[in-house]
Swiss-Prot record:
Belongs to the PdxA family. It comes from Sulfurimonas denitrificans (strain ATCC 33889 / DSM 1251). This is 4-hydroxythreonine-4-phosphate dehydrogenase. It catalyses: 4-(phosphooxy)-L-threonine + NAD(+) = 3-amino-2-oxopropyl phosphate + CO2 + NADH. InterPro entries: PdxA_epsilonprot, PdxA_fam. The keyword Coiled coil does not apply. Substrate binds at residues 121-122, 253, 262, 271.
Length: 307
């Protein structure tokens, strides 16, 4: 049986992504057939800076473009190349030349400097596929999906609309159909029956309606946010839905930073990613850890087996 073929988007080459890819290649090659979206010029430049030998079976799919790597720097050229690598990886999946995409970290400011309008991978995937992709992060011990992602905190409350939230729950069910899911409230004490805010009324209505639609009590809540990730609750739930970015990711990363990954749900392709940034502060210093990347590879393979 042939190995799963995974297109690797190399991320921002001024960061740690390419170090992780080369360092983990031997182990990853035992799990799948990785195809790295980079050209030989950029790969050789990065490997020289790292003083790493490129493995003989390090297969690349050429992505055009040449620039000087500026390790640890925010740069429009590296931003543009990380975008081009990602688009190339998506195209390989669409052409059935790859079974999944795994992404290394990009830098959002570098994308902005390159004139790109997207706030990140998930934002691009939504527009590319015209689907409401869901960002979910975590590991086998706990996963957290985000209702709102990269928006200012002041805009979160106004983003909580009944129809939008209900559809989010139903889209989540399409990807994770059989698991019970803990849904967090927005306000302290989950609003204290309206004393500290009314958004929980909207969340409750959306939960009830979605559960009726999926024909079982899949979504439970809204839970009081400050106790949602306590050991007692985590014994009952593996999946959580947070109303905003830091509400869900601060506890996740405090508990499982090194091993967590990022998964895009509700899409026609499989896409997983490392759950960390470009780590410019340690770029090309041979200090980057590979566990999140290896877990992202394993999850992409597992998701493919489920389809």
């Amino acid at each position: 049986m042939s190995k799963v073929r995974i297109a690797i988007s190399v991320g921002d080459l001024n960061g740690v992504g390419i170090e992780i890819a080369i360092k983990a290649h031997e182990e990853v090659s035992k799990l799948c057939a990785p195809l790295y979206c980079i050209n030989s010029y950029m790969l050789n430049q990065a490997s020289t800076l790292l003083n790493y030998k490129i493995p003989s079976n390090f297969e690349i799919s050429e992505v055009g473009g040449e620039f000087a790597v500026k390790k640890g720097c925010v740069d429009k050229d590296s931003g543009r190349y990380s975008y081009d690598s990602f688009i190339h990886a998506i195209s390989l999946c669409e052409q059935k030349k790859a079974d999944a995409v795994v992404t290394m970290p990009i830098h959002k400011e570098a994308w902005m400097l390159a004139g790109l309008k997207y706030k990140g991978h998930t934002d691009l995937l939504r527009e590319h596929f015209k689907r409401d992709a869901i960002m979910m992060l975590g590991c086998q011990k706990m996963f957290v999906a985000l209702f709102s992602e990269h928006i200012p905190l002041k805009d979160v409350a106004s983003s909580i609309k009944y129809k939008k939230l209900k559809q989010f729950f139903l889209d989540f069910n399409n990807s994770v159909p059989n698991e019970r899911v803990a849904v967090l409230g927005l306000n302290p004490h989950a609003g204290d029956n309206g004393v500290l805010g009314n958004e929980e009324l909207i969340i409750t209505k959306a939960i009830k309606s979605a559960n009726k639609k999926v024909c079982f009590e899949q979504f439970i809540g809204p839970l009081v946010p400050d106790i949602a990730f306590t050991p007692h609750i985590r014994e009952k739930f593996k999946y959580f839905i947070a109303m905003y970015h830091d509400q869900g990711l601060a506890p996740l990363k405090a508990l499982y930073f090194d091993e967590s990954i990022n998964v895009s749900l509700n899409l026609p392709i499989i896409r997983t990613s490392v759950d960390h940034g470009t780590a410019f502060d340690i770029a090309y210093e041979k200090k980057a850890k590979t566990l999140s990347y290896i877990n992202a590879i394993k999850s992409a393979i597992a998701l493919g087996e489920r389809l």
